Amino acid sequence: MAHARSVSGVTLLDQGVYQGVWSAGLRASTNWSTLIDRFDVILSRTAPDLVVLVEADMKTIMNRLRSREDGDTRFAPDSQAFDRGIRGYESLKNRIRSTDTAPASIVIENETREDLSSGVDRIAESIHSIHN
């Protein structure tokens, strides 16, 4: 979520600066800590007001990737790219959650439709608390 500074209201971004760092790092050979350090200035200047971390257990993620009919994915389960992607997510999550200057963040589960429904409620509550 990014608050549009010049416009009243809220802007929701499905992908933001943290997603961009993860995507760049997915194909890089640099370790995640070094990569995130390199992007630190950009992250601190362009960070949204709220980062929503969406999680599911590993089995669910792997099953969802395998069930994609068109095979459209940047990495297959049980691949080096998959493992790197997971490590990158965890590295970014740890950075977001452990840095005083990082934006607010919440973790929502994405195992079931009910999880998504309660996650939407939590996101709305978080947005409301940030902007009131």
What are these regions (language model features)?
Residues 1-42:
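Glycine-rich phosphate-binding loop used to anchor ATP phosphates in small-molecule kinases
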Residues 1-5, 58, 97:
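Hydrophobic, well-ordered secondary-structure segments
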Residues 9, 49, 105:
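Conserved acidic residues
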Residues 15-16, 44-67:
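Conserved phosphate-donor/acceptor-positioning beta-strand/loop module used by diverse small-molecule
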Residues 19-22, 60-63, 115-117:
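Short catalytic/ligand-binding loop motif for oxyanion handling, primarily in non-cytosolic enzymes
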Residues 28-32, 55, 59-60, 87-91:
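Short, functional N-terminal and low-complexity linear motifs
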Residues 28-32, 36-39, 45, 53, ...:
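Short, structured coil/loop segments at alpha-helix boundaries
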Residues 66-132:
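NTP-dependent small-molecule kinase module
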